[in-house]
Amino acid sequence: MAVSPKINRREHILQCLAQMLETSPGQRITTAKLASEVGVSEAALYRHFPSKARMFEGLIEFIEESLLSRINIIMDDEKDTMKRCQLMLQLLLIFAERNPGISRVLNGDALLGENERLRSRISSLFAKIETQLKQILREKTLREGRGFNLDEAILANLLLAFAEGRIAQFVRSEFKLKPTTHFDEQWRFIQHQLLQS
């Protein structure tokens, strides 16, 4: 029974951190401000997380688990190359839109001035997603008997850059310009261009 309140407090701390990232764009989150938001002392924060970097790592773990588990579901459920790519990009954009504070972590904006390993971890997550996109595009030849005229690594990079750009616009607009705005039309255009290559 003693473990449950600790888990709930940890989750509450992370939720407050994400909320502060959303409501205080451009501002650095200090442990003093976070403790005040959570309603505990700084010492109480450190009982649950040994450092602020560990708090951000908790958010990054949530991001990784959420995105990578859903990407695995897409891979299991969908076999069409273009549909897989569409669903993966849509997943990234919807996730960012539903979690504005966390989109600042995805974008790297919230990690400025923080431990380098946090930025490396986000970079690693995007590298995994890009690798998955590249693999999907390469499998098109095997699955559908026809590949692309452009290298799949270049195409995967283009697709991910599109999603990252939409997330960056969302953060830069202080969450007013939704990442999913016009996605369907944009995807139709992107897909048409990819299939022409």
From Swiss-Prot:
- Can you list the GO cellular component terms from the UniProt entry? bacterial nucleoid; cytoplasm
Pfam families registered for this protein in UniProt: SlmA-like_C, TetR_N
Residues annotated to bind DNA:
30-49
Q: Name one GO biological process term.
A: negative regulation of division septum assembly
Function noted in UniProt: Required for nucleoid occlusion (NO) phenomenon, which prevents Z-ring formation and cell division over the nucleoid. Acts as a DNA-associated cell division inhibitor that binds simultaneously chromosomal DNA and FtsZ, and disrupts the assembly of FtsZ polymers. SlmA-DNA-binding sequences (SBS) are dispersed on non-Ter regions of the chromosome, preventing FtsZ polymerization at these regions.
Report quaternary structure and partners.
Homodimer. Interacts with FtsZ.
The family this protein is said to belong to: Belongs to the nucleoid occlusion factor SlmA family.
Indicate what this protein is called per its UniProt record: Nucleoid occlusion factor SlmA
Q: Which organism is it from?
A: Shewanella sp. (strain W3-18-1)
